[in-house]
Amino acid sequence: MTNVPTFMMNIPSSYDTAVRNNVWMEEYDDEDIIVNKPKAIREMWEVYSFLASQGFVYLLPTPIDCKLQDLVFVANNGIVLQHTPIYIGSNFKATNRIGEEVIGMRFFDSLGYKTIRSPFEFEGEAELKYLRDNIYIGGYGIRSDKRAYEWMESEFGLNIIKLELKDPKNYHLDCTIFPFTNESVIVAVDSFTKEEIKSIEKVADIIPITMDQAHTGLTNSVRVNNYLLNASDIDFLSKRSEDYRYESDKNRRLEQIAADNAMEVCYFNLEEYMKGGGLLSCLVLHVNYERMLTKLI
């Protein structure tokens, strides 16, 4: 299975929005934020089915009577290191999420991985993006501690480009950074200092996007083979609304990037997960990065 793009997802049987633990959730009133569970399962299953048609997808089991409302956002559960069979479990700053990493670590332990919980605050693959070899890009400052990356460098020989996150709407790195290939990275360039941008440029080419395009979820994408998967609710927005204008601009930019690289964009409606502050990349954890090795043309 090592040559097959492999991912992990979770059926959202415990998904809820009772605890508002990010700024995006504050935009909903008490009635609109309630999760339609059957619809959430259908939305997740659409993404699962597509990924499974292109590779392999593990399903992280949800324990009976599980109360972890955000378990479905597996990109925060931890990260699989690519040069050695080790799974680093998260150390959540969001207190209602503590315990998710235990379920993930047990699962990867059953697969034969060595599992270790980060001794410092760290919220998983959503904060630490793999590029190639031992090179990663890590976000810190809101949900993750910079010391977590220093520990990983010392313990596992990683080379981590560390970027400070300051915008509460971009509280995880995947809100501003998307490794498009192992040599290029989509970046919301206004999110970072000139020095931070230069540190990225030392290891990869930068494909720039705007902050508005980041806020509407452009970098919350997943690549599998020659497809880019992204969440979009544009079909349900009024064409006269400001939200439609922002969403349309994001989609056009993503489609431009895809077209320039002989790729195709596939959109998924994930309205139920937007209630929890999540988009497509939040639902997916990479077990490997074979999609990075696939030739674009």
Label each region the model flagged:
Residues 1-297:
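The feature marks the mature, well-folded catalytic cores of soluble enzymes
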